[in-house]
């Protein structure tokens, strides 16, 4: 099984065809698409709210109206990917983590933020969550009845709520639950950058030094990859905008974390 996390920056950067033309049977593809969510929200007259957290990360505040835009957009992206794959003769199925209880998550009841005045505050967590599990039986069932499974980052809470979750967390949980040996993370840059230049490899020996040069989403991706190395998973963070991005990444073109 090939596990691919397709970042929204690739989709919004015009790289969707590059990726779908390179997907092979036996692939599980998790996609993002936050930039498209913003566009849909603006058309709906809903202003996106991005939260800043004390750890330096940012996240989307997901209230009820934002959740509607998020689900609509993610499922549109999902079906765009599925339609492109099926047009190539690849039998693809697309679903969210809600379908058949594929991905479960715990709602974030409270989140800590830094407000516009620089003060640290605790606010309601809205409809966002942290992934708690993946139903391996359902995933295997989907893989045995199709060539490719495409997953949107929407999860199901124990209370039956749809939750906005991080696609990287879904990829991490699938990698762990299904004993995946390699994870490809496609973004809009050539890997992990240090002083503007991509580095070939991150290992336990140089990880802390490299982390100092990373921020935001890339830091989160690298931390996920480093966690997976402890479980024997090799992660390649690579540019999804290049030709044959998945094949190139599996051949080591990008930053290999192992």
UniProtKB/Swiss-Prot annotation:
What are the leading ranks of the lineage? Archaea, Thermoproteota, Thermoprotei, Thermoproteales, Thermoproteaceae
**Which keywords does UniProt give here?**
Amino-acid biosynthesis, Arginine biosynthesis, ATP-binding, Cytoplasm, Kinase, Lysine biosynthesis, Nucleotide-binding, Transferase
**Top-level taxon of origin:** Archaea
The primary site where this protein sits is: cytoplasm
- Its protein name is Putative [LysW]-aminoadipate/[LysW]-glutamate kinase
The record's section on SUPFAM superfamilies has: Carbamate kinase-like
**Which family would the database say this protein is a member of?**
Belongs to the acetylglutamate kinase family. LysZ subfamily.
Which amino acids does the record list as binding substrate?
A: 33-34, 60, 164
**Cysteine-cysteine disulfides:** none
């Amino acid at each position: 099984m090939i596990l691919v996390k397709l970042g929204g920056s690739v989709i919004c950067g015009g790289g969707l065809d590059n990726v779908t033309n390179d997907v092979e049977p036996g692939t599980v593809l998790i996609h993002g698409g936050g930039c498209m969510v913003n566009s849909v929200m603006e058309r709906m007259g809903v202003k996106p709210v991005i939260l800043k957290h004390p750890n330096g990360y940012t996240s989307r505040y997901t209230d009820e109206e934002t959740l509607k835009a998020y689900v609509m957009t993610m499922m549109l992206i999902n079906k765009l990917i599925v339609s492109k794959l099926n047009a190539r003769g690849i039998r693809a199925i697309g679903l969210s983590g809600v379908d058949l209880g594929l991905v479960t998550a715990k709602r974030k009841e409270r989140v800590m933020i830094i407000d516009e005045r620089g003060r640290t505050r605790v606010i309601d967590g809205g409809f966002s969550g942290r992934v708690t599990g993946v139903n391996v039986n359902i995933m295997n069932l989907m893989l045995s009845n199709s060539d490719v499974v495409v997953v949107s980052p929407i999860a199901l809470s124990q209370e039956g709520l749809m939750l906005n979750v991080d696609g990287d967390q879904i990829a991490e949980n699938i990698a762990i639950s299904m004993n995946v040996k390699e994870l490809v993370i496609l973004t809009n840059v050539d890997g992990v950058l240090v002083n503007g230049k991509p580095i070939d490899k991150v290992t336990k020996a140089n990880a802390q030094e490299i982390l100092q040069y990373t921020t935001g989403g890339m830091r989160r991706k690298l931390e996920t990859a480093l966690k997976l190395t402890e479980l024997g998973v090799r992660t390649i963070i690579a540019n999804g905008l290049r030709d044959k991005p998945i094949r190139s990444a599996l051949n080591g073109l990008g930053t290999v974390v192992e």
